[in-house]
């Protein structure tokens, strides 16, 4: 008989975990719980969707390689190009001037922090003949485009559509979804060896309304995949614990736009990822996607307050959006009349499709937590069943790599929970408080 399993947080990590758990246990014993009235309304749905195979340091390298290969395999098996825009990608670092190239950090440095991968040597390209250079990027005299990825080591997805696919598959198998709903308390029973975890009380919600219903979900296995809210969820359920789950948030504004210079006729050569710098003091990142869209972001802040998860989609800040729109116009707008001169300021043919603000879960040490919490850290004498029959687990803090690491995390976490040998060594991601 499958151990009842509750997953708190139905973002990309939660639905990936449910997807792989349901391959090896009765799907009806898996319960997904999420407080947002609109699923995937934060980092899972508003991320860039950039995938990398080998941009990671030793602790993350095995998980990165596993996840990258699983993204490829899943897309190949389920028509990922059509269903969620999976495509190989070519990555570049871009400097608009020689001065910017010499004085500024590379635009991809923040992504490479802690990696053991050596910087790629600069390569010169003939834009007219390469076929894999981004024709949608505005080029100016004196700029520099540097290849920073090896062929076959980076890719692109639309994260919202990937999340929706995984959730559809879970529900079709029989996984249960409760949303909007939030955890209220754990339920225990003394079987003679301490107060054993046997369930979670959840409060079912209606958007903007008070509590409408309380429900007990029986479980002996509890998984917290609540992104930036993971620490809050743990504290709600285990207020007596001395353990703090140190997940904080990194807020990021983003745009999804259309450009007449990126269209279906160009998608056969794959998508692009471009990292650059901007004189506004931030590092724009832009990713072309299958379907004619370009994702533009890079304006991040660790000081924006984390909203209540049950309020759903966060409201972007007008000033930040205006700054992004101007940077997008400067970087992606039409070229001028020739000679590599930029177009006039009022000449903008970019169409804004979506604007967003999301909150990425991060740790101070730059690596996610994927671990079972020891019973002694839970406190109050609460115990969980041994081995694959029980446990409290946490998976969060993936930072800018949540989508890239999602499938590998789902595989490994499902294996940990079910007592199977893990497909990647994630011992370096354990957490001991």
Across the structure, where does each feature detected by a protein language model lie?
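Conserved Rossmann-like nucleotide-cofactor binding loop
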Residues: 13, 38, 229
